[in-house]
Every structure is written in structure tokens, then in C-alpha cells.
Amino acid sequence: MAYPFQLGFQDATSPIMEELLHFHDHTLMIVFLISSLVLYIISLMLTTKLTHTSTMDAQEVETIWTILPAIILILIALPSLRILYMMDEINNPALTVKTMGHQWYWSYEYTDYEDLTFDSYMIPTSDLKPGEMRLLEVDNRVVLPMEMTIRMLVSSEDVLHSWAVPSLGLKTDAIPGRLNQTTLMSTRPGLYYGQCSEICGSNHSFMPIVLELVPLKYFEKWSTSMLT
């Protein structure tokens, strides 16, 4: 869960989000080193009075500043491609959930069950109970089993939306006429909040997402109660 004046990412609760945090730190270190080197060179150029007459035609320097950026780009691209593959590859999911974006709410369908569907609307501020989050609570939470691979199918009924849950490293565009997929797995139970991340109209800010990750036995009890 995010908190006021937060500078970093939310705590990772999925393997993909952990990989994204490592990649962020890896890339930030490279950017910091490059920025430090550039600032050092600029300070030298501003403070020294000496000039190197052969710098205008130095093959060695040109070779270095051609090869070195290529190596840096490779060091950034390789872990990025690995994470992209992890996010797209879904092997034998234990559960498939289809979510549809509407103006301005979400609907969910558990495709492994015969008739388990519901809509999820934001709870108005006037109806909130003590301790609940303003603009983030919904009337129907998405209950899912933890420590299991879940496939999310994301689409839209009307305009562009985006289904995003930051602490799980999820952000998938909901496009009318197209079915996108992403994988989800939580390493611990809890409530995970998200919102629509694509401006979709006047009530775009009122499309929260709440995932409730629970142990498998509690998920089975919940699904049974929803079907009866």
C-alpha cells in the first residue's frame, strides 16, 4: 500500500515485482554512474584552461564513445528482455480470471467456474466505514488464492482502460475488441489496491481495483458461497 510522500515503489508481493525492483536498482545505478561521469567531465572543461589540439581528430576517443554506450545498452536490455518474457509467459495457470473495463467500473468472470461473475464499483465516500480507503474501496473484491499462478485476461467494453495493481507489478491495457493477458502470483496474503491507469473519461479516478489474496481453502469457501 502506498503512503504519503513515498519516493520509492510499493513493497513487492510477487516474483515479477521483485524482478522489476531489481531491474530498477540496476538501471538506476548505471544512470547514476553515467551522470556522475558527465558532470565530472563538464566540471573539468569549465575549470581547465588547457586544450588538446588533436582531440578534434582522435580515432581512439571516437571508438571508445561508440563501443561503451553499446555495451551499456546491452547491460540494460538483457535483464529487461528477461522480465518481459517472464511477464508474458504463462505455463499451466491454476485459475483464469477475465476482467472487463467499463465506464466506470470493472466486471470480473472466473472462467473456470460455470457462473461466477460480478461487477465491482467504487464505494462512495459517504458510505465508507472507519479505516477504509477513500476512492480505493469497492463493493465486490476480487478474491484469489495466494501462491498460485493466475492468468488475468483483460479487455474493455467501451473505451481504453488500464488494469493496474502496483504492488504486484501489474499494468495491462484494456482495449475494446482485444484480449490481453498477464500473470499474477502473490507470495503473501492481504489486500492489494490498484486503479485504472488510462484516462477514460470524467469518472476515470473512480475505478479502483481491490484484490484479496487468501489461502486456497478460504478461496474455495468464498467461491462456494458465491455460487450458492
From Swiss-Prot:
GO-annotated molecular function: copper ion binding; cytochrome-c oxidase activity
Catalytic activity: 4 Fe(II)-[cytochrome c] + O2 + 8 H(+)(in) = 4 Fe(III)-[cytochrome c] + 2 H2O + 4 H(+)(out)
Co-factor: note: Binds a dinuclear copper A center per subunit.
GO cellular component terms, A-Z: mitochondrial inner membrane; respiratory chain complex IV
Mitochondrial intermembrane side: 1-14, 88-228
Keywords: Copper, Electron transport, Magnesium, Membrane, Metal-binding, Mitochondrion, Mitochondrion inner membrane, Phosphoprotein, Respiratory chain, Translocase, Transmembrane, Transmembrane helix, Transport
Cofactor: Cu cation
Cross-referenced InterPro entries: CcO_II, CcO_II-like_C, CcO_II_C, Copper_CuA, Cupredoxin, Cyt_c_oxidase_su2, Cyt_c_oxidase_su2_TM_dom, Cyt_c_oxidase_su2_TM_sf
Chain sites annotated for binding Cu cation A2: C196, E198, C200, H204
Phosphotyrosine carried by residues: Y218
One of the GO BP terms on file: ATP synthesis coupled electron transport
Localization: Mitochondrion inner membrane
Mitochondrial matrix compartment residues: 46-59
Transmembrane segments: 15-45, 60-87
Binding site for Mg(2+): E198
Record's bilayer topology term: Multi-pass membrane protein
Gene3D superfamilies cross-referenced by the UniProt entry: 1.10.287.90, Cupredoxins - blue copper proteins
Keyword match Transmembrane: yes
Residues annotated to bind Cu cation A1: H161, C196, C200, M207
Highest rank taxon of the organism: Eukaryota
Keyword Protease: no
Family, per entry: Belongs to the cytochrome c oxidase subunit 2 family.
UniProt cross-references to PANTHER family, sorted A to Z: CYTOCHROME C OXIDASE SUBUNIT 2 (PTHR22888:SF9), CYTOCHROME C OXIDASE, SUBUNIT II (PTHR22888)
Binding partners and assembly: Component of the cytochrome c oxidase (complex IV, CIV), a multisubunit enzyme composed of 14 subunits. The complex is composed of a catalytic core of 3 subunits MT-CO1, MT-CO2 and MT-CO3, encoded in the mitochondrial DNA, and 11 supernumerary subunits COX4I, COX5A, COX5B, COX6A, COX6B, COX6C, COX7A, COX7B, COX7C, COX8 and NDUFA4, which are encoded in the nuclear genome.
Protein name per its UniProtKB record: Cytochrome c oxidase subunit 2
Source organism (scientific name): Sus scrofa (Pig)
Lineage: Eukaryota, Metazoa, Chordata, Craniata, Vertebrata
